[in-house]
Amino acid sequence: MTPPTAGDDILSRIADTLATRRPEAGGDPQSSYVAKLLSKAPDAFLKKIGEEATELVMAAKDGQPDRIISETADLWFHCLVALTHYNLRPEDVLAELARREGLSGLEEKARRPRD
């Protein structure tokens, strides 16, 4: 497998595919895992996000690089499903990361609105 280059837009391509799995776009829960998650949303994909985050924590705690990569991919995928459900795109998240770039973590946190 050739590693992706910096110019690859894999997150955007995955988001495009996920959008076709939305029930209102004709996604069939009988034949598509994503359509099934979206048809049971949000509980189904939120549960998966929690499971994948826990598995990532366990892999990191065990110091297993291959599992860390695999579990991160699983977590990101299910986060992309959540973005799809809420009509958001990975580009929205990337824009937020770009906005935060160069800020001190403490400074950025202090700028957030209080609930």
Swiss-Prot record:
- Name one matching Pfam family: PRA-PH
Provide the alphabetized UniProt keywords. Amino-acid biosynthesis, ATP-binding, Cytoplasm, Histidine biosynthesis, Hydrolase, Nucleotide-binding
Q: Does the keyword Amino-acid biosynthesis apply?
A: yes
Q: Entry's CDD domains?
A: NTP-PPase_HisIE_like
The keyword rRNA processing belongs to this UniProt entry's keyword annotation: no
What GO molecular functions are on record for this protein? ATP binding; phosphoribosyl-ATP diphosphatase activity
Localisation per UniProt entry: Cytoplasm
Which GO biological-process labels does this protein carry?
Answer: L-histidine biosynthetic process
Gene3D superfamilies this protein is in? MazG-like
Give the main location: cytoplasm
Q: Which SUPFAM superfamilies match?
A: all-alpha NTP pyrophosphatases
Domain of life, source organism: Bacteria
Could you tell me the EC number(s) of this protein? Answer: 3.6.1.31
Pathway noted in the entry: Amino-acid biosynthesis; L-histidine biosynthesis; L-histidine from 5-phospho-alpha-D-ribose 1-diphosphate: step 2/9
Give the CC-aspect GO terms: cytoplasm
Q: Which reaction does it catalyse?
A: 1-(5-phospho-beta-D-ribosyl)-ATP + H2O = 1-(5-phospho-beta-D-ribosyl)-5'-AMP + diphosphate + H(+)
Span-the-membrane segments of this chain are none
The record's similarity note reads: Belongs to the PRA-PH family.
Under NCBIfam families, the record lists: histidine_hisI, PRK00400.1-3
Name-wise, this protein is Phosphoribosyl-ATP pyrophosphatase
Lineage of source species:
Bacteria, Pseudomonadati, Pseudomonadota, Betaproteobacteria, Burkholderiales
The encoding gene is hisE
